[in-house]
Swiss-Prot record:
Pfam families hit by this protein: GST_C, GST_N
EC number: 2.5.1.18
Domain GST C-terminal intervals: 90-208
Subcellular location: Cytoplasm
GO CC terms of this entry: cytoplasm; cytosol; extracellular region; mitochondrion; protein-containing complex
Protein residues bound to substrate: Y116
The name this protein goes by in its record: Glutathione S-transferase Mu 1
GO biological process: cellular detoxification of nitrogen compound; cellular response to xenobiotic stimulus; glutathione derivative biosynthetic process; glutathione metabolic process; hepoxilin biosynthetic process; nitrobenzene metabolic process; prostaglandin metabolic process; response to amino acid
Higher taxonomy: Eukaryota, Metazoa, Chordata, Craniata, Vertebrata
Job description of the protein: Conjugation of reduced glutathione to a wide number of exogenous and endogenous hydrophobic electrophiles. The olfactory GST may be crucial for the acuity of the olfactory process. Participates in the formation of novel hepoxilin regioisomers.
Reactions performed catalytically: RX + glutathione = an S-substituted glutathione + a halide anion + H(+); prostaglandin A2 + glutathione = prostaglandin A2-S-(R)-glutathione; prostaglandin J2 + glutathione = prostaglandin J2-S-(R)-glutathione; prostaglandin J2 + glutathione = prostaglandin J2-S-(S)-glutathione
Source organism of the structure: Rattus norvegicus
Further remarks about this protein from its record: Yb subclass selectively binds steroid hormones.
Phosphoserine, modified sites: S67, S205, S210
Length: 218
């Protein structure tokens, strides 16, 4: 029985989950909920089901795998990673994975707060000034390793890929000074399952955010 992944019909928090499901050749189906247009931004597709799915903390995204019903994007990522032994093999690798997981969420929320802010255009110039330091930290942490935890792919590479790609879309020159990050993106996109998925009709690169956002909302 295929797993069910539920989320809005956008990239959002679910991009790394979709990529991980594809990489692991998992059997899954998507339930993509549509949001209405302005001014009401109707969310009834989701709200009509929200409390009928048996979720402990009803929210999007959710993953239903048989009797297991999981919400919170990183909880879903960790669940899938444990199933497929992608959490890191040594304590050092698991520590690195934990750090990257939380760093990615910090940087994700910073971009979200900007892009959903009514003063987006006014605040964007100052935000752009902070990006080089963010990218520098990722570059130094990755170093000469092929993957963020070490020599093998782990679930945090899917998270890192997503956030670096989002920032790269937001500011196309932000990785120019960090060749190891550009190489990482290319290496990730070159993974056989990932490459095939990105060429498929199921792949959703944009919009990154919902219709309520000021950027990448359609």
């Amino acid at each position: 029985m295929p797993m069910i992944l539920g989320y809005w019909n956008v990239r959002g928090l679910t991009h790394p989950i979709r990529l991980l499901l594809e990489y692991t050749d998992s059997s899954y189906e998507e339930k993509r909920y549509a949001m209405g247009d302005a001014p009401d931004y109707d969310r009834s597709q989701w709200l009509n089901e929200k409390f009928k799915l048996g979720l402990d903390f009803p929210n999007l995204p959710y993953l239903i795998d048989g009797s297991r019903k999981i919400t919170q994007s990183n909880a879903i990522m960790r669940y899938l990673a444990r199933k497929h032994h992608l959490c890191g093999e040594t304590e050092e690798e698991r520590i690195r994975a934990d750090i990257v997981e939380n760093q990615v969420m910090d940087n994700r929320m910073q971009l979200i707060m900007l892009c959903y802010n009514p003063d987006f255009e006014k605040q964007k110039p100052e935000f752009l000034k902070t990006i080089p330091e963010k990218m520098k930290l990722y570059s130094e942490f990755l170093g000469k390793r092929p993957w963020f935890a070490g020599d093998k792919v782990t679930y945090v590479d899917f998270l890192a890929y997503d956030i670096l790609d989002q920032y790269h879309i937001f500011e196309p020159k932000c990785l120019d000074a960090f060749p190891n990050l550009k190489d990482f993106l290319a290496r990730f996109e070159g993974l056989k399952k990932i490459s095939a998925y990105m060429k498929s009709s199921r792949y959703l690169s944009t919009p990154i955010f919902s219709k309520l956002a000021q950027w990448s909302n359609k």
